[in-house]
């Protein structure tokens, strides 16, 4: 009788399409919601701080479940877990769509998060089981399509929906697709490995939940409240202590819930560090570009989304291709080329002005998307290929946990840099516009006089208007310079990643050399062969 792995291996692409559809919906939904936040504030009559809990709550549930995913996969099997995850996500999406108030909306988001938090490591683990290391790049390339294309196309789609329809369509539209994925998966998805009746490590689970939830909450609040805020400091410290205790406890455990011994494998450790750097760079663009395009330049959500659309198309095309290239050339060439492109294009964003052409930003973003598409999945696959099959679920859980944490910390750090540098530049501009400066005073008086003549207004009115104009431009210019400085830090992160990528190697060749060496050791020595 064929095993579940053999049945799935007969037609892996059909199963892969179903898995990608489910994962794509979960990731796309997060991007769609970000654009809808202002409309939800108006609809439910809540503040920006309150509405942010739709994102914070989702992130916290994700942060708790992802480290537990290795245990859940082993205990319940891939098939049951995928069906439950998709059911939770689809149910939560429906609740969000019909939500009459904010409380119901938040409940829907938390239900969604239960499914979304499990899907990413689960899908990744399943791909590792379906595809052998020599052809794994192709499968991971398609996995990267959902990971990178969904957040890239989300702003365009959500901007178009909000401009022409109600925000509820963003949720209603996902429900039937989610239902179809559940039905198809029910019939074609078989367990790769049979579930094992293992016990939950209660202490480890408590330490994990307290640690990751506290750290993620503290870091997410640091972006708005600052790192010196008492609540931010206390939650980050509690989270850090609990995570250290969790690591020590897991290393001493005979059957760890999350096996930190995966870091004994050098390429997995190296690829994890590079992926942390890439994640920070990716989140920098996702966070800062909408601020620049919408808050400073004045584009609509749809215009901003359309600017990002060519980059999304590049990712759509390149993600599967990068997987094929990985299978042929290995990780190092792709990582070096991808990071070179990412370094150059990220640096280009340090040169933004309030008048930077729309097409120039679009071109840079598209080229940057090309570089990113060569990076994320090949680098991650290189690390996963080094792990033995028994550690696959632990490796995917670890990779996704690090991605979640680095994304949150990266966003908070970039927010802090952007805010602090904006304040610094504003104070510098204010110093230059001091009335004690004779050059400024002369220019200011000329502007006031010209305005009085051209608009036929009083001196006080003209003076107020000129001051308002100066402060407005000072605010715009300082914000743009703050964004440029934040992108400079992201560029330096990418340079560090580029240096590290030189040390990547293709572990498939290591395994091949080891196999040949073992085969040669079994051959008789030349003298023995001659005598026989």
UniProtKB/Swiss-Prot annotation:
The keyword Disulfide bond appears for this protein: no
Sample GO molecular function, one term: transmembrane transporter activity
Main location: membrane
InterPro entries with a match to the protein in the record: EmrB-like, MFS, MFS_dom, MFS_trans_sf
Transmembrane is among the record's keywords: yes
Membrane-spanning ranges: 13-33, 53-73, 80-100, 111-131, 142-162, 169-189, 203-223, 231-251, 273-293, 306-326, 334-354, 361-381, 483-503
Pfam families per the UniProt record, alphabetical: MFS_1
SUPFAM superfamilies: MFS general substrate transporter (SSF103473)
Subcellular location: Cell membrane
Single GO cellular component term: membrane
Domain of life: Bacteria
Topology relative to the membrane: Multi-pass membrane protein
The entry's keywords: Cell membrane, Membrane, Transmembrane, Transmembrane helix, Transport
UniProt family annotation: Belongs to the major facilitator superfamily. EmrB family.
PANTHER family associated with the record: MAJOR FACILITATOR SUPERFAMILY MULTIDRUG TRANSPORTER MFSC
Identification of the protein by name: Uncharacterized MFS-type transporter YhcA
Native species: Bacillus subtilis (strain 168)
Originating gene: yhcA
